[in-house]
Design a protein with these regions (language model features):
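Amphipathic, low-complexity, repeat-rich surface-exposed segments
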Residues: 1-173
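Conserved beta-strand in the GNAT
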Residues: 176
Length: 176
């Protein structure tokens, strides 16, 4: 963002923190690859359960993948939140899109980079993969990403309805 060029001191501080954290992560990487114990440099947020399986800590390769992903996401978000001169609305909008993109690119979302999904596929003899592909094909055919099964909600049984009026409407929601 061009705002950083207008604030060279803040940019310098940001880059120094990045360089220091990068050096610490590189030392951690060398230690892990050498088979030595090394505490994680970047910890997931307490409510982030994506890396809660012990394999993400106990196996060096998976641990490093987790560490590099968390390092990258943490620094991208820090840079965004510290960007000088951004209007609050612009900052929130950018944070929303960056957070969604970073979450979408998490190693936990891809079979090749998710040891938990790989283990599940082996345990289930591929049934989890087959079911996932079926859901994907259903979503492609429906031209939407469904979060529930189409028949999950029935008016009067699992879905309540009452007469009402819209009391609040904005870009994200309607409150009735």
């Amino acid at each position: 963002h061009a705002a950083w060029l207008m604030h060279p001191q803040e940019l310098s501080d940001l880059l120094l923190r990045f360089a220091g954290d990068l050096a610490a992560l590189q030392v951690h990487t060398v230690q892990k690859l050498a088979g030595r114990a090394s505490a994680d440099v970047v910890l997931p947020q307490p409510d982030d359960l994506r890396f809660s399986d012990p394999v993400w800590t106990s196996e060096p390769g998976w641990s490093l993948l987790k560490q590099w992903y968390l390092f990258y996401t943490r620094h991208v978000q820090d840079a965004l939140f510290q960007t000088p001169g951004l209007a609050p609305k612009e900052r929130r909008r950018a944070a929303f899109w960056w957070r969604n993109w970073l979450n979408a690119m998490a190693p936990t979302n891809f079979l090749a980079t998710n040891p938990v999904a790989q283990r599940k596929a082996v345990e289930m003899r591929g049934d989890s993969l087959r079911r996932g592909l079926e859901i994907l094909m259903d979503d492609v055919q429906a031209r939407t990403v469904r979060m529930t099964e189409p028949g999950d909600f029935h008016v009067g049984t699992t879905l309540a309805t009452t007469p009402g009026a819209v009391v609040l409407r904005n870009r994200l929601l309607e409150l009735i």
